[in-house]
């Protein structure tokens, strides 16, 4: 299954906002990457409790979902942005959307994913 699809979490902003607020995007992305590292560093129960509270779910249900996917660390994401791995994930996602008829055009991933922000945010 993982060779046919990928589940990506993405945050969206308009191009004008990205141009005018790059520092905000880098700081926000850096915070997300650090949170990913924190959760991966043997803080899964604590993280599940925080997520459960924010999403109004019981902690056990949230904690059990940790095996539903391959959860990357922030460093893995930023390194993957640098070496092309993350771009490949988005390329696969785009191909699946096109095959399903959900997307009609085939733009380069770099037109809609700010890989440079991911790379810069990973410099911590």
Q: Model-found features: residue ranges?
A:
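Short secondary-structure boundary/hinge segments and terminal tails
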Residues: 4-6, 69-70, 113-117
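Short Pro/Gly-enriched coil loops immediately N-terminal to beta-strands
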Residues: 1-7, 90
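Conserved C-terminal helix/tail region of periplasmic/extracytoplasmic solute-binding proteins
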Residues: 90-124
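Homeobox/homeodomain signature
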Residues: 1-3, 14, 61-62, 102-103, ...
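Short, structured secondary-structure boundary patches
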Residues: 1, 15-16, 81-85, 121-124
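A bilobed periplasmic-binding-protein/Venus flytrap-type ligand-binding module shared by bacterial periplasmic
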Residues: 6-23
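Secondary-structure end/capping motifs
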Residues: 19-102
